[in-house]
From Swiss-Prot:
This is 4-hydroxy-tetrahydrodipicolinate synthase. Catalyzes the condensation of (S)-aspartate-beta-semialdehyde [(S)-ASA] and pyruvate to 4-hydroxy-tetrahydrodipicolinate (HTPA). It catalyses: L-aspartate 4-semialdehyde + pyruvate = (2S,4S)-4-hydroxy-2,3,4,5-tetrahydrodipicolinate + H2O + H(+). The active site is at 133 (proton donor/acceptor), 161 (schiff-base intermediate with substrate). SUPFAM superfamilies: Aldolase (SSF51569). The gene is dapA. The lineage of its organism: Bacteria, Pseudomonadati, Pseudomonadota, Gammaproteobacteria, Pseudomonadales. It comes from the Bacteria. CDD domains: DHDPS. NCBIfam families: dapA. Its main location: cytoplasm. GO terms for biological process: diaminopimelate biosynthetic process; lysine biosynthetic process via diaminopimelate.
Length: 292
């Protein structure tokens, strides 16, 4: 079972926007050393929207090769074209990913039936474990619990990243699916509560900069140790919030650069963190102990 703290890994770039393979390797080692339970490559935080197909595949391949089976590697393969999502998922399987994360189609606003048929088609086309990803704040497409329940019965679909941050929604999804269907949080501030309700982990932005703490938080929450999990979460809350001062992954890439783990590259239309937000993020990093 894929569970625990799953980092939504950034894709390091140089100042010209080229992929920085040395920094990618450094980040993977960082997570292996700090107790991260799984790596999610080329998802939202990994800037999948601005990677070419060749770059997308190469990032997955390099992460898989370096991890070498020590922890699971999940590849972001969602698209707003069903055929493109199938192609990306096939490529991820060939590259050696353990599972795929598929965001709901964005911009074209499918119906719930369209969402069901989209994910069902991908699951039937590619034999690899697949995780649904619901993040309506970014996609303007909300996959409702009825649809999640239907899809949970489709072979190869093993779980969902529920990133609404709405704990009532999380509770409803948990109540509707079988216990072997994996419900993950995709919202750092509320992840601890979803796990205490039965969620199996957190696909985390914060884990990029505080992997050990996020791993300990997830372990405590999944063991039912609410006191420990909530205490860690309270300590991390300034960081959870500061990492969304601008659109993800702008702040987290700046934070990793500040920590000396990567360069200062990001691709247009995203831009480097605004000057006015740099000191507030730096202070949050110091407050939570990730920066001296």
């Amino acid at each position: 079972m894929i569970a625990g703290s799953m980092v939504a890994l950034v894709t390091p770039m140089d100042a010209q926007g080229g992929l920085d393979w040395d920094s990618l390797s450094k980040l993977v080692d960082f997570h292996l050393q700090e107790g991260t339970n799984a790596i999610v490559a080329v998802g939202t935080t990994g800037e999948s929207a601005t990677l070419s197909v060749a770059e997308h595949i190469e990032v997955i391949r390099r992460v898989v090769d370096q991890v070498n089976g020590r922890i699971p590697v999940i590849a972001g393969t969602g698209a707003n074209s069903t055929s493109e999502a199938v192609e990306l998922t096939e490529n991820a399987k060939t590259a050696g990913a353990d599972a795929c994360l598929l965001v709901t189609p964005y911009y074209n606003k499918p119906t719930q039936e369209g969402l069901y048929l989209h994910f069902k088609h991908i699951a039937e086309a590619v034999a690899i474990p697949q995780i649904l990803y619901n993040v309506p704040g970014r996609t303007v497409c909300d996959m409702l619990p009825d649809t999640v329940e239907r899809l949970s019965k489709v072979p190869n679909i093993i779980g969902i990243k529920e990133a609404t941050g709405d704990l009532k929604r999380g509770r409803e999804v948990l109540d509707r699916v079988s216990t072997d269907f994996l419900v993950y949080s995709g919202d750092d501030p509320t992840a601890v509560e979803l796990m205490l309700m039965g969620g199996k982990g957190n696909i985390s932005v914060t884990a990029n900069v505080a992997p050990r703490a996020m791993s300990e938080l997830c372990a405590a929450a999944m063991a039912g140790d609410a006191e420990t999990a909530r205490a860690i979460n309270e300590r991390l809350m300034p960081l959870h919030r500061a990492l969304f001062l601008e659109a993800n992954p702008i702040p987290v890439k700046w934070a990793l650069h500040e920590m000396g783990l990567m360069g200062n590259g990001i691709r247009l239309p995203l831009t480097w963190l605004s000057q006015s937000y740099q000191e507030p993020l730096r202070q949050a990093m110091r407050q939570t102990g990730v920066l001296a």
